[in-house]
Amino acid sequence: MEEEINSHLSADRIQSMLRTDRWTIHYRESVDSTNNWARQEAEEGAPDGSVYLADTQTAGKGSRGRSWGSPEGTSISMSLVLRPEIEMSRISMITLVMGLGAADGIRDVTGIDTGIKWPNDVVCRGKKLCGILTEMGPNGDYLVPGIGINVNMDRFSRDLSDKATSVFLE
């Protein structure tokens, strides 16, 4: 059965558009956190290149223990399972590479001028557009970088309105 994403895309369709077979797409309509889902799958042996997407996160994670809100239809929430063969001292580069890729992708697709706010945010006009959180397995045998991109948010709470933005608002 094909997994629908926002009634327009499906996991199978995304998979077919990729130029490589390295990535395997998995989709659920709602999860507590794509990072939690990916970590659970990694612990059960998910291979390098497994991608976990959800339309809604009920308990998305941000850096420093903060929550990341992603109500239905408002964001891209995605986590990967990576099993890289790199030195521990270079693992922090994964977050930077994810951020650069997101910033470039957003700019290429939308024309929005984006930048990186070290170490894990993509910003537009000084406001956060995207956040990245990379977690490591307990034995260091896998990484789970997660990314949340604010896409269709039309407003933010008063305490976030001067700090956050979305593709829609830009």
Model feature map: region roles:
Residues 1-7, 86-114, 124-170:
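Long, positively charged amphipathic alpha-helical accessory segments at protein N-termini or as interdomain linkers
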Residues 1-108:
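N-terminal lobe of the biotin/lipoate ligase/transferase fold
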Residues 46-48, 118, 127:
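Short, basic and Ser/Thr-rich N-terminal targeting/leader segments
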Residues 29, 116-118:
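Short loop/edge segments at beta-strand edges and connector loops
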